[in-house]
């Protein structure tokens, strides 16, 4: 690992940096999002994780960015994931309990959301969205799987996320 990379990304462990670059993310995109290595229980708790989730430290911390350009929430990728109850497969990503769904948009792509002439990619997962961003594509990452385009209203009804009001879709090429 070169000295310059460590200087640019001082809050990211070499293992986490290697994982991200192996997933086709550039160091600029990694730095702009603010990926970080979280090594302690306290660091995970301050990001909204439950006590059970916080015990999974160390983890890759993934800040989430909303359609208005605000950092709003976190997703975590524990180094040693816990098994899902339903099928015992690893739960690779953790989202703090109670955190609401949002359309995640890399900070460098915020200004392109309202331009219907810019092609748009919609994908499941921040890392995939950031890989597209690393290659110049405007991408929205859905949180919470393929149903991440929607949320729940105060009465428990399923509704489209209000974030969609910031995304121009008229005549836009969307994948």
Outline where the language-model segments fall:
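Short, small/acidic-rich helices and loops at N termini and domain boundaries
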Residues: 1-64
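Phosphate-handling DNA/RNA-contact segment within nucleic-acid enzymes
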Residues: 45-173
């Amino acid at each position: 690992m070169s000295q310059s990379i460590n200087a640019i990304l001082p809050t990211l462990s070499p293992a986490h940096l290697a994982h991200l670059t192996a997933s086709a993310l550039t160091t600029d995109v990694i730095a702009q999002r603010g990926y970080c290595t979280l090594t302690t229980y306290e660091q995970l708790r301050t990001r909204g994780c439950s006590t059970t989730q916080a015990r999974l430290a160390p983890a890759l911390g993934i800040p989430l960015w909303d359609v208005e350009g605000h950092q709003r929430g976190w997703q975590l990728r524990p180094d040693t994931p816990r098994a899902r109850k339903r099928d015992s497969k690893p739960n690779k990503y953790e989202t703090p309990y109670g955190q609401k769904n949002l359309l995640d948009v890399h900070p460098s792509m915020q200004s392109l959301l309202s331009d219907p002439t810019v092609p748009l990619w919609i994908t499941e997962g921040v890392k995939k969205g950031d890989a597209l961003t690393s290659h110049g594509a405007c991408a929205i990452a859905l949180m919470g799987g393929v149903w991440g385009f929607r949320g729940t209203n105060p009465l428990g009804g399923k509704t489209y996320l209000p974030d969609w009001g910031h995304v121009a879709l008229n005549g836009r090429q969307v994948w």
